[in-house]
């Protein structure tokens, strides 16, 4: 069973944090024949029937029905990237999770089924193999919507075809500081890729963290999408590394000032917003990656989750604000 109070999933603890690649994800969107799409369910019972059908095929995964959860626990799942903010809005929705939470299957978001396989490093092909195996299991027992000319049929036209979204989460402080991200976004957009915020489409960028993903799925195979995205991501990584080298060679004093100012704020602030905290943490991580800082308890990925309101807020203790609690946590982990 998923631990709602664990700040990061077990799969994220298995490897050392990378300087740039935070995580990779493969998502497959699937719909069921003879069911209206989730956004058009006549009643909640239609949604619960879909949940039961999917759960029956995958009994080894833990089911969490969102209608039985409070808002704070729902937001914890969002913070850990196990569900999307959109899933919360659906009255009859659920998520299936494996033990280490590297597999997350959203039920009744925009589509009936969204299979997610998540991992560290640039492991897109391995993750696709995992997601594809689950997809095959579902396909053997359920009537999946598929057209021999178009491919998998999805609610959003941009997902029609393979129904696959491949994405990589990158920490790019160098490119952000040098204001290169708009140019990169325009360039990769011409090749069918996009840059989004930390929680996908329409979300805000926090802590110089960007999600790079494919935009279209029609007309390309899964392998082509994965290969092309991997190449694009590798080029962005190379450019980030070049910028970091330039920051140390030609702008070292300014870079050190930026890093140590952020460290000082994290070590001494008494109240701090999520937005400011994320950027200060990003610059401290940059300092660690460049070899300027050594902080034994500093874990960027985990801190970026644990300082979110869902993990801080306690309605039984209203004497201390979320921003104050956040500052207390950050002082503890940046000494």
From Swiss-Prot:
CDD domains: bacterial_phosphagen_kinase. InterPro entries: Arg_Kinase, ATP-guanido_PTrfase, ATP-guanido_PTrfase_AS, ATP-guanido_PTrfase_cat, Gln_synth/guanido_kin_cat_dom. Its EC number is 2.7.14.1. Residues 20-243 form the Phosphagen kinase C-terminal domain. GO terms for molecular function: ATP binding; creatine kinase activity; protein kinase activity. It holds the Pfam family ATP-gua_Ptrans. GO terms for cellular component: extracellular space. Keywords: ATP-binding, Kinase, Nucleotide-binding, Transferase. Coiled coil: none annotated. It catalyses: L-arginyl-[protein] + ATP = N(omega)-phospho-L-arginyl-[protein] + ADP + H(+). ATP binds at residues 23-27, 81, 114, 165-169, 196-201. PROSITE patterns: PHOSPHAGEN_KINASE, PHOSPHAGEN_KINASE_C. GO terms for biological process: phosphocreatine biosynthetic process. Catalyzes the specific phosphorylation of arginine residues in proteins. Belongs to the ATP:guanido phosphotransferase family. PANTHER family: ARGININE KINASE 1-RELATED, ARGININE OR CREATINE KINASE. This is Protein-arginine kinase. The lineage of its organism: Bacteria, Bacillati, Bacillota, Bacilli, Bacillales. The gene is mcsB.
